[in-house]
Curated annotation (Swiss-Prot):
Keywords: Ribonucleoprotein, Ribosomal protein, RNA-binding, rRNA-binding. It comes from the Bacteria. SUPFAM superfamilies: Ribosomal protein S20. Residues 1-20 have a biased composition (Basic residues). Belongs to the bacterial ribosomal protein bS20 family. GO terms for molecular function: small ribosomal subunit rRNA binding; structural constituent of ribosome. Binds directly to 16S ribosomal RNA. One of its GO terms (cellular component) is small ribosomal subunit. Residues 1-21 are annotated as: Disordered. GO terms for biological process: translation. NCBIfam families: S20. This is Small ribosomal subunit protein bS20. Pfam families: Ribosomal_S20p.
Protein backbone atom coordinates (compact mmCIF):
# COMPACT_ATOMS: atom_id res chain seq x y z
CA UNK A 1 0.00 0.00 0.00
CA UNK A 2 2.86 2.35 0.80
CA UNK A 3 4.18 3.52 -2.53
CA UNK A 4 7.71 4.83 -2.75
CA UNK A 5 8.01 8.54 -3.39
CA UNK A 6 9.87 9.51 -6.54
CA UNK A 7 13.49 10.44 -5.80
CA UNK A 8 14.09 14.19 -5.91
CA UNK A 9 17.04 15.62 -7.77
CA UNK A 10 19.98 16.74 -5.69
CA UNK A 11 20.35 20.51 -5.51
CA UNK A 12 23.42 22.01 -7.16
CA UNK A 13 23.96 25.00 -4.92
CA UNK A 14 25.45 24.66 -1.46
CA UNK A 15 22.53 26.57 0.03
CA UNK A 16 20.13 24.10 -1.56
CA UNK A 17 22.06 21.13 -0.19
CA UNK A 18 22.04 22.71 3.26
CA UNK A 19 18.29 23.29 3.01
CA UNK A 20 17.78 19.58 2.22
CA UNK A 21 19.83 18.60 5.29
CA UNK A 22 17.85 21.00 7.47
CA UNK A 23 14.53 19.78 6.08
CA UNK A 24 15.34 16.20 7.04
CA UNK A 25 16.12 17.20 10.64
CA UNK A 26 13.11 19.50 10.94
CA UNK A 27 10.80 16.88 9.44
CA UNK A 28 11.97 14.30 11.98
CA UNK A 29 11.48 16.72 14.88
CA UNK A 30 8.01 17.75 13.68
CA UNK A 31 6.97 14.12 13.20
CA UNK A 32 8.07 13.30 16.73
CA UNK A 33 6.18 16.25 18.24
CA UNK A 34 3.07 15.48 16.17
CA UNK A 35 3.14 11.93 17.50
CA UNK A 36 3.63 13.13 21.08
CA UNK A 37 0.61 15.45 20.68
CA UNK A 38 -1.66 12.69 19.43
CA UNK A 39 -0.49 10.27 22.11
CA UNK A 40 -1.15 12.82 24.86
CA UNK A 41 -4.68 13.44 23.58
CA UNK A 42 -5.37 9.69 23.34
CA UNK A 43 -4.14 9.12 26.89
CA UNK A 44 -6.63 11.65 28.25
CA UNK A 45 -9.47 10.13 26.22
CA UNK A 46 -8.60 6.63 27.46
CA UNK A 47 -8.60 7.81 31.08
CA UNK A 48 -11.98 9.50 30.59
CA UNK A 49 -13.48 6.38 29.00
CA UNK A 50 -12.12 4.26 31.85
CA UNK A 51 -13.79 6.65 34.30
CA UNK A 52 -10.56 7.27 36.23
CA UNK A 53 -10.94 10.84 37.48
CA UNK A 54 -7.47 11.25 39.02
CA UNK A 55 -5.65 9.77 36.04
CA UNK A 56 -7.71 11.84 33.60
CA UNK A 57 -6.90 15.05 35.49
CA UNK A 58 -3.21 14.16 35.68
CA UNK A 59 -3.01 13.24 31.98
CA UNK A 60 -4.93 16.40 31.03
CA UNK A 61 -2.35 18.59 32.79
CA UNK A 62 0.47 16.86 30.91
CA UNK A 63 -1.46 17.07 27.65
CA UNK A 64 -1.92 20.83 27.98
CA UNK A 65 1.84 21.39 28.10
CA UNK A 66 2.43 19.23 25.02
CA UNK A 67 -0.43 20.85 23.09
CA UNK A 68 0.79 24.38 23.88
CA UNK A 69 4.34 23.51 22.83
CA UNK A 70 3.22 22.03 19.53
CA UNK A 71 0.92 24.98 18.81
CA UNK A 72 3.65 27.52 19.61
CA UNK A 73 6.00 25.80 17.17
CA UNK A 74 3.32 25.96 14.48
CA UNK A 75 3.11 22.21 13.92
CA UNK A 76 -0.63 22.27 14.58
CA UNK A 77 -2.66 25.46 14.30
CA UNK A 78 -3.31 27.26 17.58
CA UNK A 79 -7.07 27.06 17.02
CA UNK A 80 -6.90 23.28 16.68
CA UNK A 81 -4.90 23.11 19.90
CA UNK A 82 -7.41 25.32 21.71
CA UNK A 83 -10.31 23.27 20.35
CA UNK A 84 -8.76 19.99 21.49
CA UNK A 85 -7.98 21.38 24.94
CA UNK A 86 -11.50 22.76 25.30
CA UNK A 87 -13.21 19.52 24.32
CA UNK A 88 -11.03 17.38 26.55
CA UNK A 89 -11.43 19.83 29.42
CA UNK A 90 -15.21 19.50 29.13
CA UNK A 91 -14.94 15.69 29.20
CA UNK A 92 -12.68 15.74 32.27
CA UNK A 93 -14.99 18.17 34.08
CA UNK A 94 -18.04 16.06 33.23
CA UNK A 95 -16.23 13.03 34.62
CA UNK A 96 -15.39 14.91 37.82
CA UNK A 97 -19.01 16.03 38.28
CA UNK A 98 -20.40 12.56 37.60
CA UNK A 99 -18.16 10.92 40.18
Amino acid sequence: MASAKPKKKNPRLASGRKRVRQDIKINAANTSLRSKYRTAVKNVEKAVLAGDKTKATEQFAKMQAVVDTVADKGIFHKNKAARDKSRLSAKVKALALAA
